[in-house]
Amino acid sequence: MGLFDKLKGFNETNTEAAKRLYDKATSEYKAKNYYSAVRLYEMAWDKDPDVGTFFFLSCCYYFEWGTSKDEKRCYELTRHAAIKDHPAAMNNLSFFLNTGYGCQEDRVEGRKWLERAANKNDVRACHTLAHNLHTEAKDDPKLL
């Protein structure tokens, strides 16, 4: 915001403020200033959760970077990022659903998210899906 904006009474919308906070949080995250990143991401989320995927914030809650571990919040943020088409979030959501991390266990839904992540060329999802298919084929030889 420049001097002219201040003089004319510039009013930032919630979405604009959220985007500014989100971008600053991402810079802090990449600089490994996790405590600051978490606070900025949460402020952005409160203003407008649709300004970004918030995938890095979910990582902070999972790994306890700049915050304490919070399985439910981590799941919520990961699901948000997956719905916004983030392949790594889709893979992580699959893991959470398959294990009940922060949510009710749902292996059928977990498999759907794993396949979606693999279709988006997420390498970890492709590997996990191949492993699962191999295991299923060993358990049911008719699949070979």
What are the roles of these predicted feature ranges?
Residues 3-20:
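TPR-adjacent "capping" and linker segments in tetratricopeptide-repeat scaffold/adaptor proteins
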Residues 16-46:
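Alpha-helical segment of the N-proximal tetratricopeptide repeat
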Residues 24-27, 54-63, 92-99, 128-136:
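Hydrophobic face of amphipathic alpha-helices that form TPR/SEL1-like repeat modules
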